[in-house]
Amino acid sequence: NPDRMWEFSAKHKVEILGISPTLIRVLSTMGDDLPKKHDLSSLRAFASTGEPWNPAPWYWLFEKVGNSKLPIINYSGGTEISGGILMGNPLLPQKAGSFSAPCPGIDADILGEDGASLPAGEVGELAIRKPWIGMARGFWEENERYLETYWSRFEKIWVHGDFAMKDAD
């Protein structure tokens, strides 16, 4: 039932709706009528994680469902770091598919092949330069695999395995 999420959100007066970009890609193809027929006035924000956005579904959610008022809090992290690396900040202007800043306490950076910070507009490895609260010390009974996976690319720098790019703004 493509209407189920909107029904549930209205019935239970959901305030923060967690979604994935793929879900919104699919729902946006079904038109604007499904969300519009429900009272979604309890919604205060959308939370999104798990994959990158492309502009069309982001704008559909922001404009058609959120009435150009509700922030889409984009979040990148992972279970292996016990939280987030980058996040959207609802107090800052929204930009389709982007993050506003690193999560508090995270020294995130985007690195080139040589491990140096990249300027805006260049794609590189998403990394964390300093220890953080909740930082894992290894995998269960596989510490060597943990070190090889996240710590072997650059000295004393944790590498997430995702690519990222800073915007000029």
Regions inferred by a protein language model and the residue ranges of each:
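ATP-dependent adenylate-forming carboxylate-activation enzymes
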Residues: 1-8
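Conserved ATP-binding/catalytic segment of the ANL
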Residues: 119-121, 127-169
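Hydrophobic beta-strand positions
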Residues: 109-110, 165
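Short, P/G- and charge-enriched loop/turn segments at secondary-structure junctions
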Residues: 92-98, 149-150
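Gly/Ser/Thr-rich phosphate-binding loop
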Residues: 6, 14-19, 28-94, 107, ...
